[in-house]
Amino acid sequence: MKFTIMSKGDQSSDTLASTMKEYLLDFGFIMDEKEPDIVISVGGDGTLLYAFHRYYNRLDETAFVGVHTGHLGFYADWLPTEVEKLVIAIAKTPFQVVEYPLLEVIIRYVNGSKESQYLAMNEATVKSAEGTLVTEVEIRGEYFETFRGDGLCISTPSGSTAYNKALGGAIIHPSIEAIQIAEMASINNRVFRTVGSPLVLPKHHTCVLKPAAGMNLQITVDHLTMVHQDVKSIQYRVANEKVRFVRFRPFPFWKRVRDSFVADK
């Protein structure tokens, strides 16, 4: 089996990554940064997001597992003290693969140039680069509303505990193939109205944003931030691809939610 390790870059994470690499090589595993079967993320959720985007083009062949050394390890289910146990599990235990839905983002342009396509594991956001975002919102090909406000956040179920939660969105279990649209400071008065609530769209339902002409947009996809000009539309839907996580033991979603947001430390 081929593996690679991505570290957060701090001293403790680098030390753990080096230790795991030596252990796995001793077990006869092959270090392969280009085509790994397993990617081990050592850090926090941000490190795993970087790992996902590095290998997004081979999601059918690569699975991820995380060792938590960061501030929040929602995707990482192993502690630094369990590194030896994890290595032995990888070497000797048949593992289960759990799949999570992803968000597909397609940006199309007024001038007809080639569209830009992205995958998000947590969320994608859109804001105006110069003030209020004004955009038509279409759902399933039909006009839904005209949004005016700071921006919109479109999240995956696993990403619903991140920015989406801070915006008042619902937490969705990753077994549900859906995307969620949450507003950022929408303008609502006698003249302008939005639905004012997060929307949950199931698989095969598409949301298309059509921004006002001449608007420069700041678009994020997970940790990536870009400015796009001359945007005709942005399409969001549940992606055909899924991210795969290696599981050697139960890692209940609701327990993670409770431990992250409710349980006493």
UniProtKB/Swiss-Prot annotation:
<feature type="active site" description="Proton acceptor">
    <location>
        <position position="45"/>
    </location>
</feature>
<feature type="binding site">
    <location>
        <position position="150"/>
    </location>
    <ligand>
        <name>NAD(+)</name>
    </ligand>
</feature>
<dbReference type="Pfam" id="PF20143">
    <property type="entry name" value="NAD_kinase_C"/>
</dbReference>
<keyword id="KW-0418">Kinase</keyword>
<protein>
    <recommendedName>
        <fullName>NAD kinase 1</fullName>
        <ecNumber>2.7.1.23</ecNumber>
    </recommendedName>
</protein>
<dbReference type="GO" id="GO:0005737">
    <property type="term" value="C:cytoplasm"/>
</dbReference>
<dbReference type="GO" id="GO:0003951">
    <property type="term" value="F:NAD+ kinase activity"/>
</dbReference>
<dbReference type="InterPro" id="IPR016064">
    <property type="entry name" value="NAD/diacylglycerol_kinase_sf"/>
</dbReference>
<keyword id="KW-0808">Transferase</keyword>
<dbReference type="InterPro" id="IPR002504">
    <property type="entry name" value="NADK"/>
</dbReference>
<dbReference type="InterPro" id="IPR017437">
    <property type="entry name" value="ATP-NAD_kinase_PpnK-typ_C"/>
</dbReference>
<keyword id="KW-0963">Cytoplasm</keyword>
<keyword id="KW-0067">ATP-binding</keyword>
<dbReference type="InterPro" id="IPR017438">
    <property type="entry name" value="ATP-NAD_kinase_N"/>
</dbReference>
<keyword id="KW-0521">NADP</keyword>
<feature type="binding site">
    <location>
        <position position="148"/>
    </location>
    <ligand>
        <name>NAD(+)</name>
    </ligand>
</feature>
<dbReference type="GO" id="GO:0019674">
    <property type="term" value="P:NAD metabolic process"/>
</dbReference>
<dbReference type="GO" id="GO:0005524">
    <property type="term" value="F:ATP binding"/>
</dbReference>
<comment type="function">
    <text>Involved in the regulation of the intracellular balance of NAD and NADP, and is a key enzyme in the biosynthesis of NADP. Catalyzes specifically the phosphorylation on 2'-hydroxyl of the adenosine moiety of NAD to yield NADP.</text>
</comment>
<dbReference type="GO" id="GO:0046872">
    <property type="term" value="F:metal ion binding"/>
</dbReference>
<feature type="binding site">
    <location>
        <position position="185"/>
    </location>
    <ligand>
        <name>NAD(+)</name>
    </ligand>
</feature>
<dbReference type="GO" id="GO:0051287">
    <property type="term" value="F:NAD binding"/>
</dbReference>
<keyword id="KW-0520">NAD</keyword>
<comment type="similarity">
    <text>Belongs to the NAD kinase family.</text>
</comment>
<keyword id="KW-0547">Nucleotide-binding</keyword>
<dbReference type="GO" id="GO:0006741">
    <property type="term" value="P:NADP biosynthetic process"/>
</dbReference>
<feature type="binding site">
    <location>
        <begin position="122"/>
        <end position="123"/>
    </location>
    <ligand>
        <name>NAD(+)</name>
    </ligand>
</feature>
<feature type="binding site">
    <location>
        <begin position="45"/>
        <end position="46"/>
    </location>
    <ligand>
        <name>NAD(+)</name>
    </ligand>
</feature>
